[in-house]
Each structure stands twice: as structure tokens, then as C-alpha cells.
Amino acid sequence: PKTFWETKAPPDERNRIRMAMRCILLRGARTMLIDAGCGDKMSAKEAGIYGFDRARNLDHSLAAAGLSTGDIDIVIASHLHFDHAGGFTTMVDGQARPRFPNARYKIRRDEYVDATHPHERNRASYFAENYVPLVEAGVVDFIEGDGEVLPGISVWRTGGHTMHHQLIKIES
């Protein structure tokens, strides 16, 4: 209930609270991202609905780590809601294109099916321009089932947040 959490996260005049969107960067034999945040495709009006602070974005964070979008080899999706998958694509000449030009994207097939066939309760969270262009570009490796998808990286369907949300386990 709001009475419990509002002392720690007071809402603004539009009843929004400050939230962070964190991607996970893994560096080793490959350079990987788990999720990519909301991206930069939303209009100022759309971003304002959620109160997104666009002063710093994923490109800034990659640059701070000495990287660019071209350095990412693998992107793994926990699920395809816009605040996790919005950064998978960027606009180029009015078309959504893969944001990470040298990456393969690992997406759970059943999550993709749900995202491309949303129902009344979840359609506001799935935006096709975040993932359909990846399939069209041939850069998606669909995940079927649970287990290791790369050496030291396993995925497990947990459901809950979305029907096919997955946990990503990292072992090193």
C-alpha cells in the first residue's frame, strides 16, 4: 500500500515515483548486456507520462565503461516490456533498427509470441518496434526452454511479471 512506501519514495504532483532502470553489462570473452532500458524512441510526451530522466542514457553508461553500441556482442532479454527492451532498437531514417549492430539478441520465443499478440491487460507494455525489427534483421536467436544459452549463462522461465519472464543466471 502507498502509505507504506511513500515515505521512502514520495510521489510527485503527477503521482509518479523516481525509479531506476539498470542494465547489466558483462565483460569477458564476449561483451553482453542483459536488457537495455527504455531506449530513446519515445516522444517527450510519452517519456513524460513515466517521468523518465533522459539526462543520462545507456550510451552514456557504455561510454563511461570505454564502450560503444558496436562493442556489444550479445543482448539477452529478461522480457520484452518497453522499459527493458526499448533500448534494443533505435530510429534510423524513420525506421527502427537494431541499436547494437554487431550483437545477437537472445529472446525467449514464447515471450516474443506473447509480445506480438498482446491482450487487453498487457498491450500498453509491449511495443513492436522494440523487437520485431530485430527478427526482420535476422539478429535474434530464440530461446526454447531453460538451461545454458552461452557458456556460464543460463536462463530459467519464472513467469510472474510476464507469462514468460526469465531469470538470467551468471556463473564465472
Kindly give the residue locations of the regions a language model identified.
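Conserved beta-strand hairpin/beta-sheet module of binuclear metal-dependent hydrolase folds
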Residues: 1-64, 167-172
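Extracellular/periplasmic catalytic domains that process cell-envelope and extracellular macromolecules
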Residues: 17, 98-99
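Residue-level marker for buried hydrophobic side chains located in beta-strands
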Residues: 32-34, 76, 105
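Conserved G/P- and acidic residue-centered "switch" motifs that form tight phosphate/ATP-binding loops
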Residues: 35, 79, 161
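Short active-site segment of divalent metal-dependent hydrolases/proteases
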Residues: 38, 82, 164
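Metallo-beta-lactamase
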Residues: 53-67, 71-83, 99-157, 162
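Metal-dependent catalytic neighborhoods of phosphoester/phosphodiester hydrolases
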Residues: 86-95
